[in-house]
Amino acid sequence: MLNMPSKLHVIGTPVSSDKIVTSSSTHPELNIQPQEMPILMTFANSPYLFMGKFTVEKNVTLYFAPKSELNQNKINWKPLTTASDEIQNIIAYGNDLYLLSSKGNPHFNILKTNLQKPDLKNAEIVFKGTSEWKVSKIFLAKDFIIINKSKNELIIKQSFYNLKTGKVSSPEIKLE
């Protein structure tokens, strides 16, 4: 489907009362193409709202705004990433943003930047994929990022990044 808007639906209300949050007509400055789907993302522990322009391309263009702007007539989206940043996933925690990126590392890095002054060029690398273990997915679980690493896309291991301490642990799970 082309030219899809992103809407806010309140459970228990009719779909006809859904509010259009972002679309090519409400936000022409975002240059949302007909084939791009504007998808909203929120994280419980972050005061920010994110909007990604998604297509079949893995790398996503992202924008962000304070969650409080959801109550306004129009959200003032600020640019965050472009497809050339090679970002495939994000996790927000407080004012920090963690990004899964293949830029500069075909085995992926997890980057960290502060959303009060985001700076991807100088983002901290908190976890590096290696030629043996590629970072394949990241998930948020309370105060941790679960990092799925794959070896030849056949063997999967997990590491855990503690969002409070910044420490990575990789427990060995023995299968008998």
What are the residue ranges of the model-derived segments?
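Peripheral, non-catalytic segments that deliver or gate enzyme domains
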Residues: 1-176
